[in-house]
């Protein structure tokens, strides 16, 4: 084959294998342009994200490379943009960033310093610290405080305490490095021992104690409502009142009613002064202030005052009277109520206890009539054993007024029953039918019936036979041990019986039989309670005073309460009465 033949064949082959190139249309160009634009947008977005990530990483690198900042405590500002601060125990004179408002800084406030020791930000006040007690307030925003181990030091008052009514004895938090006190801490030990709320009990809630209520109103409210007359006659109001008598007869209720009545008297007095545009104790009274007028009732939990550490009980008594003086200085009457007073203030030197009262009693005496006057404060003590209270407390000038709270007589029992057995209670239909539907008449009849049963001098009501030291014997009835608390319990028993009968029979309402049965059941529960081991102590607490009792015989009733068993139950008196309470 010649070269010309090969050339011809090659040319034919190339010409045969090469197709014709198609011509581009405008639609194809537009489509390719759209694809390229989308790719360009995605690329720009990725580049933007990468740029932002780079900037973020650069900022983190700069943050990591920064030197650590420090905190300091602001002391004073000099007016030229420079400050005195305390940092790490060192007093420093530094500058401040223009972004910091120096007029808002207060002494003791935290500030932030940069690496050049320039104040760049303001913070708050230190929320933690050691506890110290204020001993004396000094000039220029300083105070003398007592810390651990009775260590005394002078500290500065932080701006957070500006205007706070501080006084000696307040507990404060202190930052020992800067020497600032920041916050007043409530005294939990006093809060646990007293109750400042004014009770919602008034004299109308107390039955059977009309003469005693009149006595205590004359002693407490008369001097408060008419102070000018007392000053005119040179008469001082009583400093204290002793309520004594058997348990459950209303001593605590009377004390609460006194506080409530004083609060109402304060409100009336302030309201009258506000309407007249006058003053109370030299200060103008607004209507809003008059509406907030009240009194304080410090209910001291007596046994909780006792402490195993020497001097702690006396310190608690001082704190309580300090609290009372603080409230009284604001023009509010304060009632300090000691319940079970004999547990704290026994006769000194009797040897019936650990003799802690040798220092507790003098502390109370110094608080009541010591060098510091006790104005607008009335001390009320309640006790079942007034014979065990130290005579120095009971003398005139301390507990001036002594009111005996007797057990209720039949008329008093009717008044007490009427407080708990009211016409709004459901009454059984049969009892209503007997009185032509008159609910008030039904209730009066119920009360009359149960009081007659309770106070009857019958054999079924015999409770105890006591033998005195002289050999005389006396039979005591359940009425001799009746109390307001027992009457309330009888009514509650009757209500519960009425509920049980309704659930069993479907008949709703209280019946007179419920009350009589409740009275008998209450007697049954109490017949095992007399302390025949120490009969004289038990009788004194129960209100039976006079000749010493050496023997008690309980008279056991039949189960149905219809009569007395043939043999009474006796327990021999111990030869040594031992320690009581």
Swiss-Prot record:
Keywords of this entry: ATP-binding, Chaperone, Coiled coil, Nucleotide-binding, Proteasome
One GO term (biological process): modification-dependent protein catabolic process
Stretch list, region Disordered: 1-28, 561-581
InterPro entries: AAA+_ATPase, AAA_ATPase_domain, ATPase_AAA_core, ATPase_AAA_CS, NA-bd_OB-fold, P-loop_NTPase, Prot_ATP_ID_OB_2nd, Prot_ATP_ID_OB_N
Listed Polar residues bias regions: 14-24, 572-581
Pfam family, one: AAA
Pathway(s) served: Protein degradation; proteasomal Pup-dependent pathway
Annotated ATP binding sites: 248-253
Family: Belongs to the AAA ATPase family.
Record note on quaternary structure: Homohexamer. Assembles into a hexameric ring structure that caps the 20S proteasome core. Strongly interacts with the prokaryotic ubiquitin-like protein Pup through a hydrophobic interface; the interacting region of ARC lies in its N-terminal coiled-coil domain. There is one Pup binding site per ARC hexamer ring. Upon ATP-binding, the C-terminus of ARC interacts with the alpha-rings of the proteasome core, possibly by binding to the intersubunit pockets.
Function in brief: ATPase which is responsible for recognizing, binding, unfolding and translocation of pupylated proteins into the bacterial 20S proteasome core particle. May be essential for opening the gate of the 20S proteasome via an interaction with its C-terminus, thereby allowing substrate entry and access to the site of proteolysis. Thus, the C-termini of the proteasomal ATPase may function like a 'key in a lock' to induce gate opening and therefore regulate proteolysis.
Free-text note on domains in this protein's UniProt record: Consists of three main regions, an N-terminal coiled-coil domain that binds to protein Pup and functions as a docking station, an interdomain involved in ARC hexamerization, and a C-terminal ATPase domain of the AAA type.
UniProt protein name: Proteasome-associated ATPase
Biological source species: Sanguibacter keddieii (strain ATCC 51767 / DSM 10542 / NCFB 3025 / ST-74)
Gene assigned in the entry: arc
């Amino acid at each position: 084959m010649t070269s010309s033949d090969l050339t011809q064949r090659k040319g034919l082959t190339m010409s045969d294998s090469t197709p014709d190139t198609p011509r581009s249309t405008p639609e194809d160009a537009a489509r390719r342009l759209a694809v390229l634009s989308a790719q360009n947008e995605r690329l720009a977005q990725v580049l933007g994200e990468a740029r932002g990530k780079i900037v973020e990483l650069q900022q983190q690198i700069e943050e990591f490379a920064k030197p650590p900042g420090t905190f300091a405590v602001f002391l004073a500002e000099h007016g030229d943009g420079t400050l005195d601060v305390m940092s790490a125990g060192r007093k420093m004179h530094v500058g401040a960033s223009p972004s910091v408002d120096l007029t808002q800084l207060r002494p003791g406030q935290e500030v932030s310093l940069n690496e050049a020791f320039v104040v760049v930000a303001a913070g708050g006040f230190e929320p933690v610290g050691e506890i110290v007690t204020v001993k004396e307030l000094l000039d220029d925003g300083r105070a003398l405080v007592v810390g651990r181990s009775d260590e005394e030091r002078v500290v500065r008052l932080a701006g957070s305490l500006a205007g706070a009514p501080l006084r000696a004895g307040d507990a404060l938090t202190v930052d020992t490095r800067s020497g600032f006190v920041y916050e007043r801490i409530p005294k939990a030990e006093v809060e646990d021992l007293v109750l400042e709320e004014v009770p919602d009990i008034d004299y109308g809630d107390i039955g059977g104690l009309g003469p005693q209520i009149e006595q205590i109103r004359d002693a407490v409210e008369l001097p408060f409502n008419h102070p000018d007359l007392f000053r005119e006659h040179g008469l001082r109001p009583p400093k204290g009142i002793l309520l004594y008598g058997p348990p459950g007869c209303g001593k605590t209720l009377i004390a609460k009613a006194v506080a409530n009545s004083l609060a109402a008297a304060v409100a009336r007095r302030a309201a009258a002064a506000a309407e007249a545009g006058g003053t109370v104790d030299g200060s103008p009274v607004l209507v809003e202030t008059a509406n907030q007028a009240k009194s304080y009732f410090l209910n001291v939990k007596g046994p909780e005052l006792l402490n195993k550490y020497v001097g702690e009980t006396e310190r608690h008594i001082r704190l309580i009277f300090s609290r009372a003086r603080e409230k009284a200085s604001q023009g509010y009457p304060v009632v300090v109520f000691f319940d079970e007073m004999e547990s704290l203030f026994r006769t000194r030197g009797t040897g019936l206890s650990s003799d802690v009262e040798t220092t507790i009693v003098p502390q109370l005496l110094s608080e009541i009539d010591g060098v510091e006057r006790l104005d607008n404060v009335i001390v009320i003590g309640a006790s079942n054993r007034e014979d065990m209270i130290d005579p120095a407390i009971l003398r005139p000038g301390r507990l001036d007024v002594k009111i005996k709270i007797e057990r209720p007589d039949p008329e008093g029992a009717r008044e007490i029953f009427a407080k708990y057995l009211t016409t709004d209670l459901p009454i059984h239909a049969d009892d209503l039918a007997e009185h032509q539907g008159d609910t008030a008449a039904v209730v009066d009849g119920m009360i009359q019936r149960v009081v007659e049963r309770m106070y009857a001098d019958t054999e079924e009501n015999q409770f105890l036979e006591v033998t005195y030291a002289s050999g005389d014997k006396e039979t005591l009835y359940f009425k001799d041990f009746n109390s307001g608390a027992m009457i309330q319990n009888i009514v509650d028993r009757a209500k519960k019986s009425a509920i049980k009968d309704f659930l069993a029979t479907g008949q709703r309402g209280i019946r007179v039989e419920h009350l009589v049965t409740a009275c008998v059941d209450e007697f049954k529960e109490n017949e095992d309670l007399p302390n025949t081991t120490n009969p004289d102590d038990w009788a004194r607490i129960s209100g039976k005073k006079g000749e010493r009792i050496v023997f008690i015989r309980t008279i056991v009733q039949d189960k149905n309460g219809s009569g007395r068993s043939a043999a009474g139950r006796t327990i021999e008196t111990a030869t040594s009465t031992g320690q009581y309470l």
